[in-house]
Amino acid sequence: MTTTTTKFRDVEIRAPRGTELMAKSWLTEAPLRMLMNNLDPDVAENPKELVVYGGIGRAARNWECFDKIVDTLKNLETDETLLVQSGKPVGVFKTHKDAPRVLIANSNLVPHWANWEHFNELDAKALAMYGQMTAGSWIYIGSQGIVQGTYETFVEAGRQHYNGDLKGRWVLTAGLGGMGGAQPLAATLAGACSLNIECQQASIDFRLRTRYVDEQATDLDDALARIDRYTKEGKAISIALHGNAAEILPELVRRGVRPDMVTDQTSAHDPLNGYLPVGWTWDEYRERAKKEPEAVVKAAKQSMAKHVQAMLDFQKMGVPTFDYGNNIRQMAKEEGVANAFDFPGFVPAYIRPLFCRGIGPFRWAALSGDPEDIYKTDAKVKELIPDDEHLHHWLDMARERISFQGLPARICWVGLGLRAKLGLAFNEMVRSGELSAPIVIGRDHLDSGSVASPNRETEAMQDGSDAVSDWPLLNALLNTAGGATWVSLHHGGGVGMGFSQHSGVVIVCDGTDEAAARIARVLTNDPATGVMRHADAGYEIAINCAKEQGLHLPMITQ
């Protein structure tokens, strides 16, 4: 048992660079470096408390657990597997060389008890940890990890509502944390201005420093004046505004201000830790959360109700309005906003056709720490996918505009067939010495076959299977069987306790033949489960993709 439970430590963690190993092989060095990278001060939101992003999404349960995970990974043999239970290393077992080196289960609760109240009780007793999606699965790469998905969403919204041209238009949103911090840059890359409301000045400062947001307004009038000037000039400039969205959005409605798109990425999924009630300071919010959690949750949800009502008002004006996956509609509905779900989530509105083809947030990181390794892989992607101008444009913009946070990394939305092709090519680049050290390949849990989340990724499935969570379980089992380097199974990411189950996968390209065999299996099977899941739900795009790719789906393709 863990006898102490230290959640704060005044220390700076950074992943090692170069080719010298702390562990016994690259297959255990990789999770070690990526765990540390999750807590890099340039990556994590609150690394001294082990918080990576998303409210209280942690990399380890407490600092004692972190130390023991590090020590265990350093000494793990090539035929052993470490088991991690909600951020705590609980066992090392003999497996085999093609088995995962780490298996992770975070935040999972029996459904009847799967709520924030019970989870917070367990968390207070150091019996559980909220892993979010990539925080507790050690593959967070900073805000870049969601930039392309947000960019693709804005671009598709532009296609649907504005004939594919966002020049001279602007997005209204809130939240500049680990996920929401991607919004201003994504809007700029898509050609739009954006007004980004954030209640913590430190988060604004972080996004300004990393060039995810361009400038900060002094007040609402100044922000609107800047928006007016830049949209008239056709410039895509992102503006941060310090304040509370639950106050500012209703005021914009009152003034009759009309954005061109409205969404939100505050941490509304976690009312106790992630959404500031109207009229409160952040310090007051954190202090009262410890002393009167029920009252704090109530106050936060009441503010969310005001926020969502304003979003509904914008929708009534004819402004394209959508939820970006933080469960704010659910929170508002619980506070009496009966029609909170009148505006759609971003997946059914804009992203699902990509999921039907297994296309999702494929990402990789250079364990060397050398940016040149990423630039070389960028070039390889262009070489292997020569005709995708949209993808090439994304890679060019990413290199120009996205600052690396921690270990250099890249995200690139590709699907079934191409993921394995790229992974095998990266492995050959390591083998030949073109890359200076191995590459890790992973993805967000927000992917086509790895999540059940009725208020987000699986919202409004055409067969009504929104809440069926067999699919992420099958995904995790298959990736384990295929030989991924580490596999994770989480609950509550993105939308909070009781509303999602999801799985993650990471695989190492170390240049060996054995790695190539594992890569071919895992990077084919993983996106194929997404095609399978959507084909099973009856989506023609997915059924056709399954047939084209030769998937063996007994009830569909045989």
Swiss-Prot record:
SUPFAM superfamilies assigned to the protein according to its UniProt record, in alphabetical order: Urocanase
EC number: 4.2.1.49
The keyword Thylakoid is annotated on this UniProt entry: no
Record: active site: 412
The keyword Transport is assigned to this record: no
Top-level taxon of origin: Bacteria
CC per GO annotation: cytoplasm
The protein's name in its UniProt record: Urocanate hydratase
Native organism: Acinetobacter baumannii (strain SDF)
Lineage: Bacteria, Pseudomonadati, Pseudomonadota, Gammaproteobacteria, Moraxellales
Gene transcribed to yield this protein: hutU
